[in-house]
Amino acid sequence: MAERKYFGTDGVRGKVGQFPITPDFALKLGWAAGKVLATQGSKQVLIGKDTRISGYMLESALEAGLAAAGLSAAFTGPMPTPAIAYLTRTFRAEAGIVISASHNPYDDNGIKFFSAIGEKLPDEVEEAIEAMLDQPMDCVESAELGRASRINDAAGRYIEFCKSTFPSHLSLDGYKIVVDCANGATYHIAPNVMRELGAEVIEIGTHPNGLNINEKCGATDIKALQQVVVEAGADVGLAYDGDGDRLIMVDHLGNKVDGDQILFIIAREALCSGKLHGGVVGTLMSNMSLELALKELAIPFARANVGDRYVLEVLKEKGWKLGGENSGHIIVLDKNTTGDGIVASLEVLAAMASHKLSLNDLAKAVPLFPQVLINVRFAGGANPLDSEDVKAVAKAVEQRLAGKGRILLRKSGTEPLIRVMVECEDGALAQSCAEEISEAVKRN
């Protein structure tokens, strides 16, 4: 794969107003993508966004660039990332564009593309767009310019899709659910999905103003959700992130239920109904208790690198359908082509309704082992993980933890940091082992 100049692992991302998240670059990116996609067939591209104020600026610039290349843009307005993947497929568009920086603060933004089948663009298409970005911009003849339109019922279409994934013989009638939409893209979707399936819904994080996305709310900060669930006597709390591809849950006692526990609940339910199709993919950070719980059910488990795109890669390699991260990215390939927070929450709610069990009961099967994370800064140059001293200490710790814990040592890809993670049923032992390895890293 060629070295990338503009695209990262998840499209283009950065601070608004700084390259590449500027209106002039977005214009050029729209044009370059349009020139490449125009050779593929369809002349329509969907553009969706989350609720950041900069989304208005970037969608206009992208649309102008696409039009100059002869492609038409259809705006969905604020929509979750998985909704754009779904709508791109159903509209038979050539591509979908999402303007979002996911769980980041409002002054970040990003631009990423979906293919016609709602998946990440093939590498060769991204590389062709990168090459086109270095060419001088031109404009098609006036009669061939693209047009702009708005899909007025985009939210309704996606709401119906989400509801269709919930078993028709079940209902959420009698459930009180607190929904935290992070003041993000699910604000007008998730509460309506739950209500239309019968639930009593209490909303938080559903008043976006362009500046408050992910601010003290959503999947990355669930304190407010935990408080409201307990105070309201709710059955469950659902927290999505800014673009709706993550889910963290809260049980009726206010306990956090993370992506590993959610993944297990969905996997066990799929196994019982004969719909599992192979095993489950987690990541290097997935809790050991998830692996052990799946092993008890004889469900195969594989670990991918951290990042939902790597989970998806391993799922495709193995032909499996279910994977995710402890951060709450849950991919159910039977239902959508990318991580989908609302669909994942409906999978868990269906398990609750089907067995008449609380979320607390379902999550008990995966009592998470304590994870101790220590970031150790080093001077740069040689990688401390290559040192014989660090290797010897790590090996000794692994022997001490054999069968009851694990270690993970990673060098940061962006900073001079070594990330030390120790996981063990005994939290005090995990802490002492992590500190021992960290001291060895500091010495080297």
UniProtKB/Swiss-Prot annotation:
Its EC number is 5.4.2.10. It comes from the Bacteria. Binds 1 Mg(2+) ion per subunit. InterPro entries: A-D-PHexomutase_a/b/a-I, A-D-PHexomutase_a/b/a-I/II/III, A-D-PHexomutase_a/b/a-II, A-D-PHexomutase_a/b/a-III, A-D-PHexomutase_C, A-D-PHexomutase_C_sf, A-D-PHexomutase_CS, Alpha-D-phosphohexomutase_SF. SUPFAM superfamilies: Phosphoglucomutase, C-terminal domain, Phosphoglucomutase, first 3 domains. The modification Phosphoserine is found at residue 102. Activated by phosphorylation. It catalyses: alpha-D-glucosamine 1-phosphate = D-glucosamine 6-phosphate. Keywords: Isomerase, Magnesium, Metal-binding, Phosphoprotein. Disulfide bonds: none annotated. One of its GO terms (biological process) is carbohydrate metabolic process. Pfam families: PGM_PMM_I, PGM_PMM_II, PGM_PMM_III, PGM_PMM_IV. Mg(2+) binds at residues 102, 241, 243, 245. The active site is at 102 (phosphoserine intermediate). One of its GO terms (molecular function) is phosphoglucosamine mutase activity. It is an enzyme of class 5 (isomerase). Its cofactor is Mg(2+). GO terms for cellular component: cytosol. Coiled coil: none annotated. Belongs to the phosphohexose mutase family. PANTHER family: PHOSPHOGLUCOMUTASE (ALPHA-D-GLUCOSE-1,6-BISPHOSPHATE-DEPENDENT) (PTHR42946:SF1), PHOSPHOHEXOSE MUTASE (PTHR42946). Catalyzes the conversion of glucosamine-6-phosphate to glucosamine-1-phosphate. This is Phosphoglucosamine mutase.
